[in-house]
Amino acid sequence: MSEQASRSDGRVFLVVVDESPEMRNALRYACRRAKRTGGRVAMLYVMDPPEAQQWGAVVDLMRQEARQQAEEVIARYADVAVSLTGQPPAIHIREGKSRDELAKLITEDRSISVLVLASASSSEGPGPLVTAFAGKLGNQLRVPLTIVPGALSEAEIDAIS
């Protein structure tokens, strides 16, 4: 596909936002690819559901606090996306299990073109989402999966994106 054709497609690069160090690599890569191809970045933050409690008020308070934290985290990284792409990202905040909510979002939002994840640079493995979607759940994706090595420097990411 030519560069011009990809620009008209409005490619959307989805990044799952969390507090892991490698997530920054996925975000940087997605932003640079979006800018170079005339696309956009979308960000997904998945809140853990509150554990079952007897009192609904406690669950409601836990949800409010989790939502506030999600909004703060995603706002911080949305600012990074704006600085790298010049445009605000699409923002999705959901509650549930990360891999389930990620799969649902990709199914529901037909504008998403590429899923960008970063592998953890620790010896514990690449991370749960990379493990899931590069493995058994990969056949459920309707979009390509790009895995950015978590150990890359910003300069190395810039060179490949």
Segments and roles (model prediction):
Residues 116-140, 152-157:
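Glycine-rich, Arg-bearing micro-motifs that act as flexible, cationic patches
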